[in-house]
Curated annotation (Swiss-Prot):
Cited CDD domains: ASKHA_NBD_HSP70_DnaK-like (cd10234)
Modified residues (Phosphothreonine): T174
Compositionally biased intervals (Basic and acidic residues): 481-504, 614-623
Record field: compositional bias (Low complexity): 578-604
A molecular function (GO) term: unfolded protein binding
Organism: Lactobacillus gasseri (strain ATCC 33323 / DSM 20243 / BCRC 14619 / CIP 102991 / JCM 1131 / KCTC 3163 / NCIMB 11718 / NCTC 13722 / AM63)
Function noted in UniProt: Acts as a chaperone.
PROSITE patterns: HSP70_1, HSP70_2, HSP70_3
HAMAP family linked to this entry: DnaK
Family under the similarity heading: Belongs to the heat shock protein 70 family.
Protein name per UniProt: Chaperone protein DnaK
Amino acid sequence: MSKVIGIDLGTTNSAVAVLEGKEPKIITNPEGNRTTPSVVAFKNGEIQVGEVAKRQAITNPNTIVSIKSHMGEEGYKVKVGDKEYTPQEISAFILQYIKKFSEDYLGEKVTDAVITVPAYFNDAQRQATKDAGKIAGLNVQRIINEPTASALAYGLDKDENDEKVLVYDLGGGTFDVSILQLGDGVFQVLSTNGDTHLGGDDFDKRIMDWLIQNFKEENGVDLSNDKMALQRLKDAAEKAKKDLSGVSSTNISLPFISAGEAGPLHLEADLTRAKFDELTDDLVQKTKIAFDNALSDAGLSVSDIDKVILNGGSTRIPAVQKAVKEWAGKEPDHSINPDEAVALGAAIQGGVISGDVKDIVLLDVTPLSLGIETMGGVFTKLIDRNTTIPTSKSQIFSTAADNQPAVDVHVLQGERPMAADDKTLGRFELTDIPPAPRGVPQIQVTFDIDKNGIVNVSAKDMGTGKEQKITIKSSSGLSDEEIKKMQKDAEEHAEEDKKRKEEVDLRNEVDQLIFTTEKTLKETKGKVPETETKNVQDALDALKKAQKDNNLDEMKEKKEALSKAAQDLAVKLYQQNGGAQGAAGQAGPQGAQGGQPNNDNGSSNGQGGSTVDGDFHKVDPDK
């Protein structure tokens, strides 16, 4: 097998490495640099990538930066002249450039690659990254999480004892914290948390905003509407940020930044590290949320962590290093360049794939829960967040109406209990279901997540064997804000969500109990005296009235009364008929209390679980 290169496709910069012998090595770009700016420019019909594109960004409006922030974002396109480009296409230009200079270095054609993504990337963002590789002419052998890759680079597989490692990854535009357990060559991710729209760019912007505000106060000129000035400010802010990692104060000088009535205006400012820390303190503190959540999800405390790794160029910021040291209670490991660790680790994984590296196993996790919408708008999870991948989970669902010919499977991703609050990944139909009473057809829904975190969903009618499948496409990806909002909302609205879920469950139970009781009464009509069924009928009428009045307290009370009356009737039927018919009668009303998902996570084939009423809508066969 030919060489498998490892690519860190970053927001601000990208890097590539390859395994030479048993050690990974960074491949330098044509300018001799070990990282390449993730910048693409269009000029006179030519596509420029990297250093040359970044250098002319000030004068060329057709320059695209930080495209990674838009990967998987539905409908997002960049317009250049009369042509539009998706984030995948722009990323592919960067990957093509990396592929070319890697081939020049290796002296052979490169076809295979391992590409890294932030641990908190969702399905759409991962799929978009894989598509970008495909567009660039690369066979993406594996998509792996950046923290896992950096752990590989630190050589932690060489440690004999089991270790729990916290990876704090703050890049140019994304941030996440992952907890890994390492030992005997196995790299198992225990949890991950983060924000796909927080990084060094945000720190740069704070400096830019400060410069703009000061300049406006001194000169009465607002630079925020001047595109050329903004690009110069961005470059100056990025340089100042880097300078302040090594010195306590830096001078920012931008001559001829604008013009006033008296002539040219120049920007001069001294920025101290203390002022920079003040401007960005809330950004640093914001990362503490993911830090705490990752530990909580892993069921660990900081005292359980054996080693802390800082990853991503933005972890060079002294305030970030100080904060992580305080939170973790130990000095982070600085032994590898944080800009290069991910690419080096990806190259090691490439060596695993090519067979050059043995005895290493990666066990990543899915960052968000996956499931479908069921009756009453409930989000029924099939795969919980932080589940080790690859994985597969099946569950049996059923129809919500008699003689329902088709079911609509609504696939969702998120953490909220109600489907309306989560993100739609896709929909598909399973048709030609034979006529049958509600609750009788058995529809097996299966979720498969592969080693790259890509989701496939299928629905199968167990009666006919007919099956429908879907691979979730990247156009349905979550935006940065949506991911952030999901978990924030889940925490803030936990009580509200619980109440709404309980209400929906009650309504579903009432519907099912009424349906089953009416069916039982119809079947026993003429077979037993009406005096025997009067209590059940009265209780049924009372429950239907409470349902019509939409009185939740009454519904709960009357549901319990009907359940008791139905059970009493079942006992009498059992005594009269020697057991057989009575047992069936008891199973009817009592079974009506079900309709909840099977929570047996130990089962992956869905067999033996209870049946769930799906949110499957009636389809008109004539349409």
